[in-house]
Each structure stands twice: as structure tokens, then as C-alpha cells.
Amino acid sequence: MGQHEVTARLSELTNTFIERHHSSSRQRPCIPLNEDTRYMLDSPCVEHVDEEAGVFYWTPRPHMDFTLFDGLEQGLEVAIHPSITAFYGSYWSDGLWCSSPFGEISLIQLWNEDDMETLRENLLGHAFQKSKRRQGLTFFIGLTADDRIVTVDNHSGEVYLEEAGRPPQRTLAASLGELLRELEPTLTPYTG
């Protein structure tokens, strides 16, 4: 699965999410503005801050940075599967909840540069744990409603369902593009 296909499907998912949100509420997605969310104002996704209403409006924005894991690749001494790079490098966005044949999942997305750095650190930690347990290298892209991890096999590009610290338990799709085609965005607020 190439970068183009993953990026195209993410574009379809984000556009569907925005259209559904607008049809439901006649406005862009918004997040309550409070002490816990004020840090989120530093993002290309933020469109408008309404202090009076206590919310800020946002929309996914194209990112198209497919070099975001170059340092991680050097540190791990392994090339990261192009579908993973495309998944995280295509958009700035809040995470997206989606329905799927195997239940609801939240797709992890990058909100801003700080999020990107945190993701790199978390992926590195995940990779070290996989190596320590002598398990195949996977990278996470989402979570299920019951806290199982949706991962992509770095070698084959297959998408799996895992529990933390355990090998993959179930194959969800032959590729990330195939998985993304099976998802339908919902209006559930992301709380990742």
C-alpha cells in the first residue's frame, strides 16, 4: 500500500467526518475551551476561538510531511513501512472515532508539532518493547473502545489487533488502505 492510497483514504474519511459534523450541528467540530484544552490552541487545525462560548473550532488540515520519521528510522535502524508514514504524515487533525466491522476504533492523528514529538517517543518505546519481547515490529495507529491496540506490521503492512505487551491476536486487514476503506467516521468526540 503506497503513501498515495493511504493519504487519499484519510482525505475521504476526514471529509466525511466534516460533512457529517456539519450536517448534524451546522458548524465545524469544536472542543470546549478550558485549562485542560488551552494547550491545543497551538495547532494548524484551529480555525476560530470563541472565548465567549468557551469553545474553539477546528478542521483537519493537510500536512504532507513524509519525512517525519526519518530520525526514528535512523534510531531503530529500520525503514518504517510507507503506509505508516503516510498515515501520520498526511493530516494535522484531532483523532477520529470510526465504526468498523470489528467495533469502534479511534484513529490517532497529529494535532501539532508537540504531538508529533510525543508520538515519535511513544513509537520508539513501543518498538523497544517489541524487540525486548522478541516480537515482530508493529506500530500503533489507533485504539479500540475496549483499549486494544490497532497496529500495522512494519514488514508486511498488515493491520492487527493487539493487547499491550502481547503479540498480535487478530489480523484486521491485509493493508492499512484496506482497513481505512472499511471505516466510517462517527461524531463521537475524541478523548485520546
UniProtKB/Swiss-Prot annotation:
NCBIfam families: PRK04968.1
Membrane topology value: Peripheral membrane protein
InterPro entries: Syd, Syd_sf
Top-rank taxon, per record: Bacteria
Organism: Hahella chejuensis (strain KCTC 2396)
Key words, A-Z: Cell inner membrane, Cell membrane, Membrane
GO CC field: cytoplasmic side of plasma membrane
Protein name stated in the entry: Protein Syd
Family: Belongs to the Syd family.
One protein family per Pfam: Syd
Protein role: Interacts with the SecY protein in vivo. May bind preferentially to an uncomplexed state of SecY, thus functioning either as a chelating agent for excess SecY in the cell or as a regulatory factor that negatively controls the translocase function.
Localization per record: Cell inner membrane
